[in-house]
Amino acid sequence: MASAIAKDAASPTVGSLPPPLLGKDRAGNEVDLAALRGKVVIVTFWASWCPPCRKELPVLGHFQRVVGRDALEIVAINYKEPRRTFTDLVRQNRDIDLTWVHDARGSVSDLYGVRSLPHMFMLDREGRVAYTHNGYSEEALPGIINEVLSLLPEEVRARPASNTASR
């Protein structure tokens, strides 16, 4: 299930390099995909008014914790909400360990051609789009987990915590 929004730009396609600058994190640091090369990166666009987004974020936070930031970076980009709403939501979800970015004007969302929420882009370790997903459902979760695991190096997949993520 996904929440629709109107957009005209095309989304980055599988195999392409997406726009590198994702905005600023909560500490004010620019999140640049070039600095994350060598890791699998998930970029997900979300909003507080999107019920599937609110279901997806805790799952992604758990996955981030299980795999570890040395191999996986999950960037959650808030879509066009007031700064106060964004900061309140991040504060309420402080136990979800993601890189939180606020896209107040929707400029990053526009560059990514986001048409519905949640909208996920999964990048391989070279920074290229490997998979994309629109919406969120419990049924799709095993496939998403397997996609992430397929992009991780063997030594990360062999870790005990990573093996439990695929069960």
Locate each region found by the language model.
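Short pre-active-site segment immediately N-terminal to redox-active cysteine/selenocysteine motifs
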Residues: 39-41, 46-49, 116
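Short, internal strand/loop/helix patches
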Residues: 75, 87-126
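Conserved redox-active cysteine motifs that mediate thiol-disulfide chemistry
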Residues: 45-62
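N-terminal "domain-start" segment that seeds a small globular fold
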Residues: 2-33
